Amino acid sequence: MIESFSRLTQAGPGSPRRATVQAAASGLGSADDQVFSRLLENRIVFLGSVVEDAVANAISAKLLLLAAEDPAADIYLYINSPGGSVSAGMAIYDTMQYVGNDVATVALGLAGSMGQFLLCAGTAGKRYALPHARIMMHQPHGGIGGTAADISIQAEQMLYTKRTLQERIAFHTGQTVEQIETDSDRDRWFTAEEAKEYGLVDHVVVRADQVPSVVSGAGMGLRRAGRTGFGPGGGSGR
């Protein structure tokens, strides 16, 4: 998979082949695609919708593409999402762990449910929230129906999913699994500062230059006319 992406990107950032990969990964066909392609050239991936299979495929493809282009450079994942499918979110999460790059995360607007999960899964020390971002944590939801046997199987899977998410959030935040279970039993809302205190993020930032990579001219910058402007891992705690 990585080798395939490498071959597609050998011609460089401005190549037609790379533009084709970007367009396919974005899932967009409008003028917005130009914006997201430009961000991708600067190693910025934007999650700005409900997390579903198509979105997860696009985000995961972008992470793999950026990892293939430069296995060492940070990737920045901006999150403004109310959450969505657990399986789709876990696909993004596992890809964040799969690539060798640090994946910094930045919350703006709302990072709720699976959005919160992906936010806290950023590389330790590189998880950011803008000052008015809201973060919401809760337990996974899902409908159960069918025969008694079906209901039993579905309930077992729900408990497994719930426990897995709690264990991963505990790992990334430093909280105990028991504390996460208690706090996520109902919707738990955090301001940016409260999220920092809880361990969901590491920094609350107001300006791009408060992120070290911006100062060094890497990652978050929109490279234009010599200017560097803008730019966020995972289960291993890297």
Swiss-Prot record:
This is ATP-dependent Clp protease proteolytic subunit 4. Its main location: cytoplasm. Disulfide bonds: none annotated. Belongs to the peptidase S14 family. Its EC number is 3.4.21.92. PANTHER family: ATP-DEPENDENT CLP PROTEASE PROTEOLYTIC SUBUNIT. The keyword Nucleotide-binding does not apply. Keywords: Cytoplasm, Hydrolase, Protease, Serine protease. It catalyses: Hydrolysis of proteins to small peptides in the presence of ATP and magnesium. alpha-casein is the usual test substrate. In the absence of ATP, only oligopeptides shorter than five residues are hydrolyzed (such as succinyl-Leu-Tyr-|-NHMec, and Leu-Tyr-Leu-|-Tyr-Trp, in which cleavage of the -Tyr-|-Leu- and -Tyr-|-Trp bonds also occurs). NCBIfam families: PRK00277.1 (NF001368), PRK12553.1 (NF009205). It comes from Frankia casuarinae (strain DSM 45818 / CECT 9043 / HFP020203 / CcI3). GO terms for cellular component: cytoplasm; endopeptidase Clp complex. It is found in: Cytoplasm. It comes from the Bacteria. Cleaves peptides in various proteins in a process that requires ATP hydrolysis. Has a chymotrypsin-like activity. Plays a major role in the degradation of misfolded proteins. GO terms for biological process: protein quality control for misfolded or incompletely synthesized proteins. Fourteen ClpP subunits assemble into 2 heptameric rings which stack back to back to give a disk-like structure with a central cavity, resembling the structure of eukaryotic proteasomes. The gene is clpP4. The active site is at S113, H138. InterPro entries: ClpP, ClpP/crotonase-like_dom_sf, ClpP/TepA, ClpP_His_AS.
